[in-house]
Amino acid sequence: YYKEFLIMKYSTKLSDTVHVMVLIAINQEKSLSSASIAESVHTNPGFVRQLMLKLKKAELMTSVAGHARPSLSKPADQITLLDIYKAVEGDKPLLHLDTHTNPDCGVGINIQLSLQGFYNEIQKAAEEKMNTITLQDIIDTYYQRISIENNLQNII
């Protein structure tokens, strides 16, 4: 028999959460409801509230119920991409093994075990790199991109 073709959905929680945190960081003096944040992320307010709840539990963000003024709980240069990843994904690995291979096939049963060590190495390296990237680094890069875009528009 053949395995059915499945469309694998990848998680965008990390990039969506970084988006939320950058919005909060650069709009500290403005009102930011979950609806306005959701509009920017192009998702629904319920999803934004779920992400924000995870950020609060991880002590990366604070907010008061009924007030649309969320804030970072510490400076952006003290929040790493790994902190954000762990807040929204927990211990979920970046790469996943296919556990639905044919157990009667020598390759099917052994390829996953062969990959596991490599996946663990990749996870470790990715987490080490993520721990060196701060939210402030991302904000700075965002502002650089905006500056370049504005300069290009002025040339045209």
Description of each model-found segment:
Residues 58-73:
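Beta-hairpin "wing" of winged helix-turn-helix
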Residues 35-41:
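A short alpha-helical element within helix-turn-helix/winged-helix DNA-binding domains
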